[in-house]
Swiss-Prot record:
GO terms for molecular function: D-tyrosyl-tRNA(Tyr) deacylase activity; Gly-tRNA(Ala) deacylase activity; Ser(Gly)-tRNA(Ala) hydrolase activity; tRNA binding. This is D-aminoacyl-tRNA deacylase. An aminoacyl-tRNA editing enzyme that deacylates mischarged D-aminoacyl-tRNAs. Also deacylates mischarged glycyl-tRNA(Ala), protecting cells against glycine mischarging by AlaRS. Acts via tRNA-based rather than protein-based catalysis; rejects L-amino acids rather than detecting D-amino acids in the active site. By recycling D-aminoacyl-tRNA to D-amino acids and free tRNA molecules, this enzyme counteracts the toxicity associated with the formation of D-aminoacyl-tRNA entities in vivo and helps enforce protein L-homochirality. A Gly-cisPro motif from one monomer fits into the active site of the other monomer to allow specific chiral rejection of L-amino acids. A motif (Gly-cisPro motif, important for rejection of L-amino acids) lies at residues 137-138. Keywords: Cytoplasm, Hydrolase, RNA-binding, tRNA-binding. It comes from Azotobacter vinelandii (strain DJ / ATCC BAA-1303). The gene is dtd. It holds the Pfam family Tyr_Deacylase. It is found in: Cytoplasm. Its EC number is 3.1.1.96. Homodimer.
């Protein structure tokens, strides 16, 4: 499982003109599910998302986590993160989880996040989404679990 996280001032996701998720200050996580991922992967990734220290403390150092700040978490499924781009000029998606597995695991990640964190929003799996964000930094990291 991969998550491309971006520290944001705000972010929202819309599907067919309808807002399906939005947050204020926090993290936007674009999540790619791979075939070997399972429920344990979800727990590990959520722990990292909530506890990765990417927010500034009083001295301006990246020393605080989303859990410590209580900011928003916007989870958006993005199977293209699992693409194999090592060769050629076109990505291969054979390294991404099949849609049924990806949807089940993404929805489980979203449900677990909502149990463990007060401000969680999500995109719609498999939909063509428009994601808007105001980057804070910019601060972007690729997490793997």
């Amino acid at each position: 499982m991969k998550a491309l996280i971006q520290r944001v001032a705000k972010a929202q996701v819309t599907v067919a003109g309808e807002e399906v998720g939005a947050i204020g200050p926090g993290l936007l996580a674009l999540v790619g599910i791979e075939p070997q991922d399972d429920r344990e992967s979800i727990g590990r990734m959520l722990h990292r998302l909530l506890n990765y220290r990417v927010f500034a403390d009083a001295e301006g150092r990246m020393n605080l986590s989303l859990a410590q700040l209580g900011g928003g978490l916007l989870l958006v499924s993005q199977f293209t993160l699992a693409a194999d781009t090592r060769s050629g000029l076109r990505p291969s998606f054979s390294s991404a989880a099949p849609p049924a597995q990806g949807q089940a695991l993404f929805e489980a990640l979203l449900a677990l996040a909502r149990e463990r964190h007060p401000q969680v929003a999500g995109g719609r799996f498999g939909a063509h989404m428009r994601v808007e964000l105001v980057n804070d930094g910019p601060v972007t990291f690729l997490l793997e679990a």
